[in-house]
Swiss-Prot record:
Protein name in the entry: Ribonuclease J 2
This protein's encoding gene: rnj2
Lineage per the UniProt record: Bacteria, Bacillati, Bacillota, Bacilli, Bacillales
Cofactor: Zn(2+)
Molecular function per GO: 5'-3' RNA exonuclease activity; RNA binding; RNA endonuclease activity; zinc ion binding
Broad enzyme group: hydrolase
SMART domains, sorted: Lactamase_B (SM00849)
InterPro entries tied to this protein: Metallo-B-lactamas (IPR001279), RibonucZ/Hydroxyglut_hydro (IPR036866), RMMBL (IPR011108), RNase_J (IPR004613), RNase_J_2 (IPR042173), RNase_J_b_CASP (IPR055132), RNase_J_bac (IPR030854), RNase_J_C (IPR041636)
SUPFAM superfamilies (UniProt xref): Metallo-hydrolase/oxidoreductase
Residues at which substrate binds: 366-370
Record carries keyword Nuclease: yes
Cofactor annotation comment: Binds up to 2 Zn(2+) ions per subunit. It is not clear if Zn(2+) or Mg(2+) is physiologically important.
PANTHER family per UniProt: RIBONUCLEASE J (PTHR43694), RIBONUCLEASE J 2 (PTHR43694:SF4)
Amino acid sequence: MSLIKKKNKNIRIIPLGGVGEIAKNMYIVEVDDEMFMLDAGLMFPEDEMLGVDIVIPDIQYVIENKEKLKGIFLTHGHEHAIGAVTYVLEQVDAPVYGSKLTIALIKENMKARNVNKKVRYYTVNNESVMRFKGVNVTFFNTTHSIPDSLGICIHTSYGAIVYTGEFKFDQSLHGHYAPDLKKMTEIGEAGVFALISDSTEAEKPGYNTPENVIESHMYDAFTKVKGRLIVSCYASNFIRIQQVLNLAQRLNRKVSFLGRSLESSFNIARKMGYFDISKDLLIPINEVENYPKNEVIIIATGMQGEPVEALSQMAQKKHKIMNIEPGDSVFLTITASANMEVIVGNTLNELVRAGAEIIPNSKKIHASSHGCMEELKMMINIMKPEYFIPVNGEFKMQISHAKLANEAGVQPEKIFLVEKGDVVNYDGEEMILNEKVNSGNVLIDGIGVGDVGNIVLRDRHLLAEDGIFIAVVTLDPKNRRIAAGPEIQSRGFVYVRESEALLNEAEEKVREIVELGLQEKRIEWSEIKQSMRDQISKLLFENTKRRPMIIPVISEI
């Protein structure tokens, strides 16, 4: 197994994302003077991140040490593993390593964002060995909900540093989804120095339901549907999409996709042979009405909450393309996260009101694309690591995974619970966590990268919750008088017609502040504006208990 004879001096493992959160995976491994980036993912914004499109890791540390970076190594083609690659490549030069499908999806992302940069791409597989000055890097096939997923092995003189990526064990899957247990066993027997492993389902007991069992239960449910069938699933779950295609074939139904998020990745994967599908199975969404309702399946796809949002719009007759009709059946394959439960519940009620029948779901028809407790222990037992670092999960999931590692025989002092920016150092004798590097989130709003910070988010929250209050006044500084105004405008604060007295009082307060400022020897515009903010804010809060954003506008003639 690609052992390194030359002794390495120092190893550093640094998570820049993917810890304390599910998504935004990015882990830096440094061996002596060589740096390797494992995954470069994004995260979709939380509800309170108003106006933010995506979130990526802060790579300032990588930029400061870019001469060391030997490459970006990717485990699979999901956005939380590859979504930040284009942004990273805009700031540093590095080759990109990934499976055939992963590289194809990266190239598509580069094209979509108009990043016209020459990049060296290396397509790797289960047999690839990439040789560097102080280490070798190899790969092993894993099972995830997207084909050609890989684990990554960095071979050092102390043993292998293994990053599992996101994985599960499912013996019912074959071909592009099959794990290479033989290769994993060989890696474990050769000696694993550190295991960096997926913690997403570390709190879920047992094993995942095998995918062939899920498909069988889906078939039983689908055969009972007499009318149009709408299946809601994530665009990233290629296994589930293939299962629906399989069942449509068996039930003699045509399939149409509703959701832009899938089109690009599906078409790429289909052209590359990752989907088993007959030529005449798919029909455009605008041709669905040409077929009897009992001869079609609509797959409503998207990222994050998009599939549920689409169903909600369809139920309320607000969707641009199609709406729910009495007699439709809806089947949800997505699992509602804690923050989505209320939204999903409301959507189900809307669907029923619109006349749809909800196909009852059971745990038998749900499987995560991440390993449950017994699968995680299986990976630990196969690899037999000296050190263990649980990643890709909320902190409580990392803790649960750490307990599993201890149960599997890893000594407690050799298990590291890390946060973003933590540096796990090994100097040849012991591994310690004794350092921190710059880390955090970079918020992307439209085409702006990193120009939305906490202050901007605070202002957006203020606008969303309490609105905006604008005071406009025109001055004649030469004659020291108010030439026009004050004029008060507000949006999202109070209903003007019902608050005329308050607005008139605010107007008089502005006039008073400005006239007082004009009496000073030297007129200080900044002081007048600040006084307007402070006193108007106090007045409005006393009367409404709300604090709108106050914008004083002073112009001169």
